[in-house]
Amino acid sequence: MKEIKQAYRKLALLYHPDKDSSDGNETRFKQISDAYQTLRLHHKTELKITIKFTDLYPEDAVSSYEQAEALIAKQNYEEAIVFYDKALERLPRYENAWIKKGDALSRLKRYEEALGCYEKVLQINPESTDAWNLKGVCLSELKKYDEALECFDEATLLNPMHYAAWNFMGVCFFNLRKLEKALECFDKATKIKPDFAVAWHNKGGVLLRMNKKKEAEKCYEKAKKLRQ
């Protein structure tokens, strides 16, 4: 790359329009500049390619993460957390490990600790829709519905097609007895994902609370068919 820079400087000085305004020099100068930029970008790309996967994700961190995932599959959440921690010792900014650790803690109903994991993710990546959604779920489990709604708002602003966030938002509104808003959320969730059985069931619950029994029955029937 050093030789390319030197050659570029020589040619640029030779054909620069300010130095020699002869016909065609401006065009040649532009061609030289364009060629240099192309070579420079190609060199940068080559440098990026030479970075090994193991430089970004050390082998021991990946191994610990994979062991944690295997334990999650067996529902051994306590042991899985130990291995997620090992992965995070080596890679403190490993977003997915923080999310999966938070999920394991949530399954153990350790919601406050899970919240800490999702906060870590949001420090690393404030636009993580999964972290906003899961943080909202934890807050909802802790009956902090207003705070949970703020999280679901963020998730759906970042991704309006996040049907799970719309569903959980509906659950919060239902618990706050804001039935019309809850119904709107479940409607959005089922429009985005028509085979979302949970949202159909939840929509039925809202309609039943609103004394719309026939409509509620249709939703329950829809949910039942989808679960078969």
Residue ranges and their predicted role:
Residues 1-15, 24-47:
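J-domain helical core
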Residues 56-96, 100-109:
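Alpha-helical segment of the N-proximal tetratricopeptide repeat
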Residues 61, 95-96, 129-130, 163-164, ...:
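Helix-start (N-cap) detector for alpha-helical repeat units in TPR-like alpha-solenoids
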